[in-house]
Amino acid sequence: MNRRIVRLTGLLAAGAIALAVVGPVSAATPQKLKGVFAVDTGAPAAGKAWVRVLHGSPDAPSVDVYVGADLATAAIVPDLSGLTFGEISKYVEVPAGTYGVKVCATGAPTVCPIEVAALALAADTKYTVAASKPLASLKTPDVFVDDTPAPDGKAQVRVVHLSADTPAVDVLTQAGDSIGIDGLTYPNRAPDPGYASFPAGSYDLKVCASAPVAPTGTLCPIDPGAKTLEAGQAYSVFAVGSLAATLPAATAPPSDVVGPTDEAPTSSTSILLLVIAAAAFVGGLGLVTSRARR
């Protein structure tokens, strides 16, 4: 078993997703837009499921995730504890079935902005469960099937728009030509379903709003130079955060791009995908990587 995948056992049957918001939680200062880079390559063992959690709520505090056969027996998962905005956990491997899941303020197991009473996970399937809306409207999670294709000698890419107040965006070449990711809106992914294939190699892309954004007008905030795309790998990039919090810094240079560590679900580090990630959002984007824990 890959040491990067955590096993949970003793959990039950099948069902649907039900969620409630409980307990008082204070909102934090809204965070700027970020691209969260995750490596999707790999597959669960037969009869198992993989699930990971993305903290994308721009004003929610750091959280711990509790999992059990039901909410009453849910226990903290060490590798899903202390998640802060813009972080995505490693995959957790579980038997197919239904799980009670609580998302609680870090260190406060009774202060839980989200309770998922019945999260159904199918066998031989990978999932990302994301919280993307502001805390006050965090009613339901976004659940995505990570339907990675078989390797074909190219890189597989998808972009997921999870910024609730950000308009549509396009990814363009330096000459202004489309690469096929245009008009991506919240809360959608591109492609849908599946992933786009890109030949391995070096790419030089920029990201622009699909329409003018006040007060800046035409906005192309990301232009990091040529980046490398690796063959045989699958990636997701999730756009999270608040455009309103980002626009005052829209003309600032983007932050440095950092690849995932060797404890991500897989260790490949295609920085290009962080560029493509920005197709899900606009305005002074800072790119971050998946968080890895032991």
Language model: regions and residue ranges:
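Short, intrinsically disordered, low-complexity terminal/loop segments
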Residues: 2, 293-294
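Bacterial N-terminal signal peptides
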Residues: 11-20
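Intrinsically disordered, low-complexity polar regions and short flexible loop motifs
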Residues: 25-293
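Bacterial N-terminal signal peptides that target proteins for export
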Residues: 2-12
